[in-house]
Amino acid sequence: MFEAEVNPSGINRAELVVSIPSYNEADSIAYPTQQASEGLSQYFPGISSVIINCDNHSQDNTRQAFLNTPTQVPKMYISTPPGVKGKGNNFRNLFRKATELGAKAIVVVDADLKSITPEWIKHLGEPLFNDFSFVAPLYVRHKFDGTITNG
């Protein structure tokens, strides 16, 4: 179901995947991408990881904005075909790719978050490597970051 897949680093295995679902988020995707990279580098240095942008065939250069964001962690872009939209389709692609990569854990953050910090990656990812199967955040958030819960 991938219309497009861009894998500049040739990643074929990753224990930890951070996914950023998107649709027309070129203006905002860089910040959560940078924060995810910092979190992975700082808190999971010994674990193979990748940041995947699961996109809905955005027309606003989301792909380029994501891939051009400087990170220490490899990135991968996958997209649905034209006309196939919705976060559910992004998640379907994410689970398919994470399975192909042999991922042991997946962390998902939204593309338009402004309050995300590297610690989010730590707090969402660490329990998954300590016998927890699911982690949901409980936090005070900025009033405009509601899209993480209003998908």
Q: PLM features: residue spans?
A:
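Short beta-strand-to-loop acidic/aromatic patch adjacent to the donor-nucleotide binding site
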Residues: 102-114
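Conserved acidic residues
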Residues: 49, 104, 133
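Short, well-formed alpha-helical segments that are part of the catalytic scaffolds
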Residues: 2-7, 25-41
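Alpha-helix termini
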Residues: 7-8, 37-47, 70-74, 97-102
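A conserved acidic beta->alpha catalytic loop
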Residues: 55-64
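Cell-envelope/extracellular polymer assembly enzymes that use nucleotide-activated donors
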Residues: 15-17, 50
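Short, acidic/glycine-rich phosphate-metal binding loop used to engage nucleotide
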Residues: 57, 80-87
